[in-house]
């Protein structure tokens, strides 16, 4: 789980993000083995959380 925290994700409060507006953003390429068991487990977990979110969102709008 520590890999997730150190992945460089920000919460929108980063003051230096505006400094790079003039620079071209380079997209990182990831080589992810889509057949790996841990990748499948991660995908299922993400989908499950997304479905819960959608269900909660739909329930609050009614």
From Swiss-Prot:
Spans annotated as Acidic: 28-40
Native source organism of the sequence: Rattus norvegicus (Rat)
Protein name: Calmodulin regulator protein PCP4
Tissue: Restricted to the nervous system. Expressed throughout the brain, in particular forebrain regions, including the granular layer of the olfactory bulb, and pyriform cortex. Also expressed in the hippocampus, caudate putamen and the cerebellum, where it is associated predominantly with Purkinje cells.
GO molecular function annotation: calcium ion binding; calmodulin binding; RNA binding
Chain intervals with Basic and acidic residues compositional bias: 12-28
Classification via PANTHER family: CALMODULIN REGULATOR PROTEIN PCP4, IG-LIKE DOMAIN-CONTAINING PROTEIN
Disordered as annotated region, ranges: 1-39
Protein role: Functions as a modulator of calcium-binding by calmodulin. Thereby, regulates calmodulin activity and the different processes it controls. For instance, may play a role in neuronal differentiation through activation of calmodulin-dependent kinase signaling pathways.
Superkingdom classification of source: Eukaryota
Entry domain remark: Mostly intrinsically disordered, with residual structure localized to the IQ domain which mediates the interaction with calmodulin.
Modified residues (Blocked amino end (Ser)): 2
Family in the record: Belongs to the PCP4 family.
GO BP terms: cellular response to L-glutamate; negative regulation of neuron apoptotic process; osteoblast differentiation; positive regulation of CAMKK-AMPK signaling cascade; positive regulation of dopamine secretion; positive regulation of neuron differentiation; positive regulation of neuron projection development
Cystine residue pairs: none
Summary of subunit composition and partner proteins: Binds to both calcium-free and calcium-bound calmodulin. The affinity for the calcium-bound form is 50-fold greater.
Cellular component GO terms, alphabetical: axon; cytoplasm; neurofilament; protein-containing complex
Start and end residues of each IQ domain: 39-62
InterPro entries in the cross-refs: Calmodulin_Regulator_PCP4-like
Alphabetically ordered keywords of this record: Calcium, Calmodulin-binding
């Amino acid at each position: 789980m520590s890999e997730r925290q150190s992945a460089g994700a920000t919460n929108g409060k980063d003051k230096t993000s505006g400094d790079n507006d003039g620079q071209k953003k380079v997209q990182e390429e990831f080589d992810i083995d889509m057949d790996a068991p841990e990748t499948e487990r991660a995908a299922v977990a993400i989908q499950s959380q997304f479905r819960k979110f959608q269900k909660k969102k739909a329930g609050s709008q009614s």
